[in-house]
Amino acid sequence: MLSQQMQNLGLPPITIGIGIATGFANVGHMGSRYHMTYTAVGDPVNTANRLQRCTGYYDLSLVVSESTVEKVPEFLFRELDTVHVKGRQRFVRLFEPVCPVEEASPDLHKRLQLHGKAMQFYRQGMWSDAERLFAKLSRDDLSNHEFYMKYVDRIQKIRTTRPEDESAHILDLTQQIGSL
């Protein structure tokens, strides 16, 4: 609502990015008797921070981890990527919440199924098949055209620079986006 009011005044909208990762963390008052603070620490806290920084790259307001997707079966998610972020040895699969399952139209289910197939081809290094599907999605789903064109561009770069690299599908964000 505030963002809309600002736009009505000709000001830029307020945009925020939220990253959500699910897992165990230590939360509470920590420190010494001279300096106490209420904080949260743990792997999911750090991962959520990295995911929050990814929101700008994908032009989204919310990015969640695979651990979160597993805990919310009543929601549909669109897989965004597999990334390597600073501070993590394991790769992180990123997702975007789409809508509650019961609210999804047959057309949306069909597009998400096609998207899932494109992501599967991409992860398997089947570049031609993945590029074909991402190009189709970019034409058919204009609201996500830029997102899908990122994949088409990445595939073209992979083909010319490292076509045999088994980890080429993993986006290395350890040195990008404000030192993720």
List the predicted regions and their residue ranges.
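Intrinsically disordered, low-complexity, charge-biased linker/tail regions
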Residues: 164-180
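Weak global preference for isoleucine
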Residues: 14-20, 155-158, 170, 177
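Compositionally biased amphipathic helical and low-complexity segments enriched in hydrophobic
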Residues: 3, 81, 172-174
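Structural preference for long, well-ordered alpha-helical segments in enzyme cores
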Residues: 47-48
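Catalytic core of nucleotidyl cyclases, primarily class III adenylyl/guanylyl cyclases
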Residues: 2-43, 67-72, 88-99
